From Swiss-Prot:
Record's signal peptide: 1-20
Single GO cellular component term: extracellular region
Distribution of this protein across tissues and organs: Expressed by the venom gland.
Superkingdom field: Eukaryota
Name of the protein: Potassium channel toxin gamma-KTx 1.1
Site features described as May represent the binding site, chain residue numbers: K33
Organism: Centruroides noxius
Keyword terms, alphabetized: Disulfide bond, Ion channel impairing toxin, Knottin, Neurotoxin, Potassium channel impairing toxin, Secreted, Signal, Toxin, Voltage-gated potassium channel impairing toxin
Principal location class: secreted
């Protein structure tokens, strides 16, 4: 039982790490209301993601 709980804790920490990496461009590139979406795409691709979009003036990597 303790092993199962330990595995679940480790898995949740790994998932949290992936989510944090996915948003690695949020602080680097704030999106303007109009345009500048290419900067977000480039930032996410340089960080190793497939691309990104602007949501609520923040860059979200996919």
């Amino acid at each position: 039982m303790k092993v199962l709980i330990l595995i679940m804790i480790i898995a949740s920490l790994m998932i949290m790490g992936v989510e944090m990496d996915r948003d690695s461009c949020v602080d680097k590139s704030r999106c303007a209301k109009y345009g500048y979406y290419q900067e977000c795409q480039d930032c996410c691709k340089n960080a190793g993601h497939n691309g990104g979009t602007c949501m609520f003036f923040k860059c979200k990597c996919a």
